[in-house]
Amino acid sequence: MVRVEKIEDEKDLDEVRILFKEYLEELNENLCFQHTDEELVSPLKKYGQPHGSLLLAYINDKPAGCIALQHLKEEGVCEMKRLYVRLGYRGKGIADALVEKLLSEAKQKGYKKMVLDTLERLQPAIKLYAKHGFVNTSAYYHNPLPGVVYMEKMLLPK
């Protein structure tokens, strides 16, 4: 059974940092333009309350995945970040549970639209996002990596 919890204090951040590092290693791309060093030091600064959210998924009380919500400067727009599920836990519905919970968090915070970026080579992720109603969109910021796909989902009426 998947359990998804909101992370709101420092004591749970070690697990988040470990998962973020695993995500970055598996992605094997240089994301320094996203200030990942700062993010690893203080994830709650970027993804904390009241505008953001940081979620951990557990299976049998073991951390299995994570996802984050980031507030963007454009009014009513947030960004999905750092969706990651550990290799041994994939195919168990964890990513679905994380995305659903994050969408719910974003709606509760009053966001009208959620955006994300991913890489063309990450087809399972693109299919997951499409399953949850995300569609391709134009770039909302400059990502210098090759093969970037930008997606969005309307959450509330404009």
Predicted segments — roles?
Residues 86-92, 120-121:
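Active-site acidic-Proline motif in GNAT/NAT acetyltransferases
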Residues 6-81, 86-87, 99-101, 105, ...:
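Acetyl-CoA-dependent GNAT
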